Amino acid sequence: FQAEDGIRDIGVTGVQTCALPIYKAIWIIYLFLCLISIVEVFSASSTLTYKSGDHWGPITNHLTLLMVGTIAVWIVHNIPCRWFKTFIALLPISWALLIAVFVIGALTNGAKRWIDLGFIQFQPSEVAKMATIITVAFILSRMQEENGANKKAFKYICGITVTTCGLIVTENLSTAVLLAGSVFLLMFVGRVPFKQLGLLAGIGFACIIIGIGTIKYIPGEVWDKIGLHRMVTWQSRLNNHFDESEIPAAKFDIDNDAQIAHANIAIASSHILGKGPGNSVQRDFLSQAFSDFIYAIIIEELGLVGGAFVAILYILLLMRIAKIARNCDKSYYIFLVTGIGILFVLQATFNMLVAVGIMPVTGQPLPLISKGGTSTLVNCVYIGMILSISRYVNDLKRQQAEELLAQQTEQSQEVAPENNIIPQEKSV
């Protein structure tokens, strides 16, 4: 990497061609994810249908949100990517909104994460994640030196990330962990010195061990008394995940234990091709079948083939993002698109690992597939930003092709007159 406006020495060389342009491939992946979302959310929303008494209400709302999201993709896609730096202003705004959540936040599923706007519940943590990634990418691009990122970049990035995660963690531990992990990987890509990354990894590992021990062994009554009610939920999830013994009926937590059990049943009964779209049985027993556990419903209905196909879509998206970064000539765009890709795919990985029982329940939705409000719209903005940077790369390659063609034409014109000179015969 060079400085902000420099050319990467491993950047575009010559004119590269591919069978399918990057931006078209990303559009196709996006549309596939939306199509799967429509089918599976419609199937998995049976609990919402029972509660509301409206068969078409949940899917109509979801379709409307996807349409608004697609419009957002198109709008952001047409914004020149140099303007994305202005989105850094969202960082202090998101911090203020996260503080406001503690005061006026709506309590949903035992957590204060949303601000109720009437027509939609707004989740400031989603905006905070986006603003943090944009800001970190900007800092890394501005502080690149010949041998890597300036050591001060590490301090600035840690300060911003700790502030954001600190405002999120009390009500949404998994989102804070997701953001911290994404920033760490982005710093690795941004060539932050290994000594600093190693120190951060050691501190992070120690905090995880201490945090798990603290949450696991301090009685829930203590957490309730000091107002940290979410600790009780985390304690239950950790105990359920690591404890293989049978849970007594008196201690059975319907919200967590039953969901995990029914998700396991959904996957175990799926086989290769599944039961077919709309034929899920466990959706009627999973209260979050349309969100946290939608991947289990996908596997139940579409089988292992369908589950693998969804995972491959996210892998292909990450590969396309890597290709955009490899062909880009500006370090800010490289770090921004890479950070978005890491955050997007890491969140999908969290959701999938929870559904198959490898991780404790986190509450992270499956990007662009789970039913959601703010998360869906912000994910659509991510896709729009990726497409905008992809368009910049395409324009760059086109410009390079034109310059190369002009250079070859000029060289051929210089050589042509020399070849047309006819030597004169010597007079005798």
What label would you give each PLM region?
Residues 35, 357-402:
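Transmembrane alpha-helices of multi-pass inner-membrane enzymes
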